[in-house]
Amino acid sequence: MYKRQVFVGLFITVMEFLLYKQFMDPLYKKIEAHNLMGVRKPRGEVKRRIVISGHIDAAYEWRHLYYGKKVPLMAIFMSWTIGGAIVSFILSVIAIVANFVDMGTFGDFMINYSYIFHFVTALGMVTLFMFVDFNTISPGANDNLTGTYAAVCALRMLDMAGVDFENTEVCAMITDGEEAGLRGCKSWAKNHYDEYVNSGVETVVLCVDTLTDREYLRVYNKDM
């Protein structure tokens, strides 16, 4: 039973959080979301396209970060849980071996009392279940008003400066549902696949998220 539960948990994690497959959606209530698109047309035929994107939805409050402004609670509890899980696994292997091999007093101790460490590890895992406060939505000024503002301002600045690109279309795409597994942009991409992939127009997308101080900026050119 334990192995089955572990497999199911890992399967859901890989499918939802690594591959972004939406196979769990039937279990949740459907709600309406919105994507917004602004387009600045070029001079002449559209041969190239630049899409600047930011997501409009905000995450629920993360308790460990909110209350850990002076003490790194997230790092502490993650270290507790991950470190404890590794040690618990090692102790479990030793306890199993001790059942078949005489390891003296040490082996007897592992068989009879190693469960105490498993219990301590479980306590650390419980703290992670309390990570998200589903009753409070974070204001989202950083994540991700900064991204949506940058996308909209790009078009606004081009307009104010009177810049009209030749054959290059510039778009501001504001998506919903990013915090819910990229559902907004995935839905938009599915509905506009032919328009943007099969149209023959070279398209590049710049996704802007959490645009903060320069020393913290990172540029990713592939899936993290």
What are these model-predicted stretches?
Residues 3, 61-85:
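Cytosolic-side membrane-insertion boundary helix
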Residues 4-37, 58-63, 95-119, 124-224:
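Acidic/histidine-rich catalytic neighborhood of metal-dependent amide-processing enzymes
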Residues 37-46, 54:
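Short beta-strand-to-loop junctions in surface cap/lid or active-site-entrance loops
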Residues 46, 57-60, 68-71, 145:
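Glycine- and small hydrophobic-enriched segments that form the cores of compact globular domains
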Residues 48-51, 203-204:
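Structural motif
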Residues 51-56, 67-69, 222-223:
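Short intrinsically disordered coil segments
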Residues 86-90:
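C-terminal single-pass membrane-anchor helix
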